[in-house]
Amino acid sequence: MLSPASRGVKLAGMERSRFLQVALDAAAAAAEVIRHYYRDDIEVSLKPDQTPVTKADVESEQVIRKAITDAFPDHGFFGEETGHEGLDAEYLWLVDPIDGTRSFVRGYPFFSTQVALMHRGRIVVGVSSAPAFGQLAWAERGQGAFLDGHDCRVSVIERLEEAAVSSGNLRTLASGPRWGDWAEVVRRVARIRGYGDFYHYHLLAAGRIEAVVESDVNILDIAALSLIVEEAGGIFTDLEGQPVGLGTTSVLAANRHLYPELAALLRVPHA
């Protein structure tokens, strides 16, 4: 739970903790940096893992990190671009300033800023900001999930034959023994799409699709989104049925009616 001292900020008639307000403010500051560089002729470098990085990635993470460390100097920080400090702190911030840098570089709007707060291993605040696409989602544990200022809930569809499922990166799944299980899911459901990145989690939380499956993610990509889906009433685990943690690399997220059946089809061991 959030500490009592963190509560008490009110905006737009809603009570928000200081933790959430700082996360929202940090994401807004990053959005200003991102808009400055978006669709500009920006230099792209490659990190050691061959993923792209730009000045926009680094500068937007710097403004997020400053906002957080100014407000909470004793908290830990784990960022995609500027590294980590205090991973064993009671409170740990998880930040990806531009999740979807390839989309950003190529000038299409499917990228986002992800800011989450973990308290003793559990995500308690999550903000997902997509400044070019024009969506902002957030959640605070026990307080519900919100998309563009409106509360959101997962769908109530109960049959796979009526469900829409979105997949992200499935490279590991494709090279393993459960690829045939995924094929059975594809055969069973009404629609398969690959909305990807932040967007399919926003759709899931808003009740517009029923499930998301990914086999190749990192915690910075999905920490905030996991809480948003859970607070919207969904279930969010990895493909082993484990809750989200620093080592999470895969996702099975769905509404509560369909999660058990999807977990069985995909042979999720601890669901």
PLM features: residue spans?
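N-terminal subdomain of lithium-sensitive/metallo-dependent phosphomonoesterases centered on the IMPase/IPPase/PAP
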Residues: 2-98, 257-258, 264, 271
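Residue-level signal for inorganic ion chemistry
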Residues: 34, 57, 68, 101, ...
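Solvent-exposed alpha-helices and their adjacent loops that cap or buttress functional pockets
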Residues: 45, 85-87, 120, 138, ...
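Generic detector of well-ordered alpha-helical packing
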Residues: 58, 62, 81, 97-100, ...
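An extended, acidic
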Residues: 153-271
